[in-house]
C-alpha cells in the first residue's frame, strides 16, 4: 500500500462516527437501488409473461395490416407451411394457430358484441394459460365442435351458465353470414376485465367452417423459451418466411408491437423510477459533499502545514480523492452484497401484495411479485452512485489546490 493510500485510510477513521454514517448512507442507497431495480425488472417480466400467456404470445405471424385493421379477409393462407418452419427453430417453445373475428353473441335475454377466437385446443394449452384460468366447467378438447369458453364477466352480462346455448352471428371471410349455436363448456377468469368481458373461444375447426376460412388462420402465435431470445427468433422467422415467395408477404410482430399499451406503461414506470433513483443518488452525493467540506474546514491548518513542508497541492487532492473513493467503494460493495442477498431471498419466496390484488389484476399480475436479480440491476444503480459521489467529492478536493500555506496555517 502506498504512503498516500495509508494516509487516506488513517484520515478516514479520524472521525469514526461521521465515516460510518457516510458509508451507511452509501450502502443503503446501493442496497435500495439493487433491490428496487430488480423488483422493477421482475415486475415487468411478470407483466409481459402474464400478458403474452393470456393474449398475444411472444411473437405472432400475421397478414400485413391485420394488426391495425382486424379485417377477416387478411389471413395466413397455409398455416402448416408456417408450422414446418417453426419446428426447425430450437428457441421456440410452442406455437399455435388462431382465428379472430367479431360477432354478436346472444343468450335468451341479452346480446353483446364480442371478439370470437378460434383455438386449437391441444396446441393452445402449451401456448397460453387459458386452460388454467377455467373456473367452471372444462377446457375444450380436439373432439369438441359446438362448444365454447367464455369470460366470467361476459357470462354475468349475458346471464348464462354452464350448458346454456349462445347464438353467434357475424360475417364470414367471403362476405357470407357466419352463424352458429354453441354450448358453454367452460367459464374462465383471467383477472383482466376487458378480456373477461368480451371474449369467447371456440374450436378452430368450427371457426374455420362458420367463417368460411378455407383452412386459413389469422394468427400464428409463438412462445419463446426466453424473453432474451425473442429478437433472434423474430429474425430467424422473417428470414425463413421470405423464402416462401408469398404474393402477400406475412409480418412477424413481437409482444411490444402487439401490446403497445403495455410497453408504454413499462416505459413510463421506468422513467418515474429513474427520477426517484436520481433523487436518491443526489441525496447521497450531497452527504459526501458535506462530509468532505467539513473535513476540509477542520483540516485547513493541517493542509497549510503539509504544503509548507513541500507537499504539493496535487498530492493533497489525490489523498482526498482516495479517501472519498475508499468510503464510497466500501459502502457500494456492502450495499451490493446485502441488496443482492435480500433480492435473492424474495426472488425465491416472492413479496405478498394480496391487499392490492384487485389493482394488480388489471395488469394481469397475481398477488405475489418476484424480483429478478441480474447484472444490470446489481451494477447499474451502484455505478451511478460511484460516478455522482466522485463528482461530488471532486469539488472539495480541488478546493484544497487554491489554499495558500501561510493563510491556511493561521486558521484555528
Predicted regions and their residues:
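Alpha-helical transmembrane segments
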Residues: 31-59, 343-346, 350
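Short helix-loop junctions at transmembrane helix boundaries
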Residues: 334-380
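Mechanotransmission and gating elements of multispan inner-membrane complexes involved in transport
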Residues: 172-273
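N-terminal Sec/SRP start-transfer signal
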Residues: 1-34, 43-44, 49, 314, ...
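C-terminal membrane-exit region of the final transmembrane helix in multipass inner-membrane proteins
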Residues: 373-412
